[in-house]
UniProtKB/Swiss-Prot annotation:
Family: Belongs to the UPF0410 family.
Pfam families: Transgly_assoc
InterPro entries: Transgly_assoc (IPR007341)
This protein's name: UPF0410 protein YwzA
Membrane topology recorded in Swiss-Prot or TrEMBL: Multi-pass membrane protein
Annotated localization: Cell membrane
Source organism (scientific name): Bacillus subtilis (strain 168)
Transmembrane residue ranges: 1-21, 27-47, 56-76
Keyword annotations: Cell membrane, Membrane, Transmembrane, Transmembrane helix
Amino acid sequence: MSFLISLIVAIIIGWLGSLFVKGDMPGGIIGSMIAGLIGAWIGHGLLGTWGPHLAGFAIIPAVIGAAIVVFLVSLLTRKRG
């Protein structure tokens, strides 16, 4: 059950991260979940574990990390021309 909650929180974090940057996260809900998980990992590495926690995620660093991930992915996947 805690794994399912972690996935739901990761989806929400990925979605919140995508709200802060211009560009779309490809892959829909799965892409948002992956951005949330990777973003939480990056946010933890860069910013630590301060702020409120939910399901093992430090929310503020995770959302900032997810915004970074969404921004980078949107740069890499945008169509040129």
